[in-house]
A protein has these predicted regions:
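N-terminal Rossmann-like NAD(P) cofactor-binding subdomain of oxidoreductases
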Residues: 1-217, 321-324, 359, 365-369
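C-terminal substrate-binding/catalytic lobe of Rossmann-fold NAD(P)-dependent oxidoreductases
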Residues: 27-66, 75, 188, 192-331
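Active-site catalytic microenvironments for nucleophilic, acid-base chemistry
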Residues: 172-176, 263, 349-356
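Secondary-structure boundary/capping motif
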Residues: 165-166, 270, 341-342
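Predominant activation on well-ordered alpha-helical scaffold segments within soluble catalytic domains
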Residues: 19, 167-171, 224-228, 279, ...
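C-terminal lid/capping helical subdomain adjacent to the catalytic/cofactor pocket in oxidative enzymes
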Residues: 330, 334-337, 347-369
Length: 369
């Protein structure tokens, strides 16, 4: 069977990366490509690298157009998905077959309406099934429950890119009770495509090249409640997780390198061999190199994640170590923000929801150097 897939927000970075993957997917046919501000233009004007779709005409982002497809992937700005998904739901309630909806934006990620209103300040659109198949649930050493939820879902919210990097870095230690979630510190080096395609003065070459720019400092970044939500799913007590989160834009187009520091719990400090206990938790969650999670690579001891190796891929690389002097654990994760951080996660969830092999059409290998 071949499924038709429409992409809303097709001219942006996330939409373009979704399309790049879908053009190589053997089980889907790319349908309508929509964008509110670019309707009537050729897709090739926005994504000249997508040669097979270059002559396709961008259509308006309207529910009636999107509803004609089996799957709709939304790659819209935060706050824009809620209205179009509500319109699609209304059409479905009228007897029309409802498409599988996959939202790459933030609108349906947060379970807490209070958290949404505090960080986003707009109307709450409700939570959908969370599109991180590798998310550990309390009591799990290998992710199964989230995959089961996705396989049964018709409404999926793709995680935030920074959220993915931080969650994958530390969740094994939270699930195993080895990390204290009350004093987590995350510093992320983030590529400029994470800021979107719209022109902004601080993103011009003259401002960005040769410069690192912190942003959303002091607990204001919108991904904080989403990370906390994930850590609570993994086993942190409700309200116990506290995260200091500082992202820094660095002069690269794609990529995230997350460095997360967490205090050791007594269980880890008092273990006969703390290093072995720590390594075992990550190995249980992700598997030794070449086994376990297909899209997460736990690196050999002494090797650290770098963004170049995951560029253009749907893979995450992770590593963990103990800082004895600080009595803390340092966990790191590198991803491509448009790959594992967005588009690959969307396609991975699409595959699960359609009953397909999870990694179909997802690029495993990076393109560096």
């Amino acid at each position: 069977m071949t499924w038709t897939v429409a992409v809303a927000g097709a001219t942006g970075y996330a939409g373009g990366e979704v399309l790049r993957l879908l053009t190589a997917h053997p089980e889907v046919e790319v349908g309508a490509l929509t964008a509110a501000s670019s309707a009537g233009s050729r897709l090739g004007e926005h994504h000249p690298h997508l040669l097979s779709l270059a002559d396709r005409i961008v259509q308006p982002t309207e529910a009636e157009i999107l509803a004609e497809h089996d799957v709709v992937v939304l790659a819209l700005p935060h706050g824009a998905s809620g209205a179009i998904t509500a319109a699609l739901e209304e059409l479905a309630s009228g007897g029309r077959s409802a498409p599988l909806l996959i939202d790459c934006g933030a609108d349906h990620r947060l379970i807490s309406q209070q958290a949404w209103e505090a960080y986003y300040g707009s109307d709450y659109a409700g939570a959908w099934t969370y599109g991180m198949p590798e998310l550990l649930h309390h009591g799990e050493t290998r992710a199964r429950a989230q995959r089961e939820e996705l396989a049964a879902s018709r409404r999926i919210a793709v995680p935030g890119c920074n959220v993915t990097a931080v969650t994958l870095a530390v969740q094994p230690g939270i699930a195993a009770g080895l990390l204290d979630p009350s004093r987590l510190t995350a510093v992320l080096a983030v590529g400029y495509s994470g800021a979107g395609k719209a022109l902004k003065p601080h993103l011009t070459a003259a401002e960005a090249l040769g410069s690192a720019q912190p942003y959303a400092v002091g607990g204001t970044h919108r991904h904080i409640p989403e990370i906390v939500q994930n850590l609570e799913v993994a086993g942190a007590a409700a309200g116990a997780a506290r995260l200091s989160f500082t992202p820094v834009l660095v002069p690269m187009s794609r990529g995230i390198l997350a460095t997360v520091t967490a205090p050791m719990t007594a269980a880890l400090r008092e273990a006969p061999d703390p290093e072995a206990a720590l390594r075992a938790a990550w190995d249980d969650a992700y598997g030794a190199t070449g086994s376990g999670e297909s899209l997460i690579q736990l690196l050999p001891e002494g090797s650290w994640p770098i963004t170049g190796t995951v560029l253009g891929s749907g893979t995450a690389t992770v590593q963990v170590a103990i800082d004895r002097g600080a009595e803390a654990v340092v966990a790191m994760c590198a991803i491509d923000n448009l790959g594992k951080g967005t588009a690959s996660a969307a396609v991975q969830s699409l595959n699960l929801a359609l009953g397909l092999e999870e990694t179909t059409a997802i690029t495993i290998q990076g393109v560096a150097p």
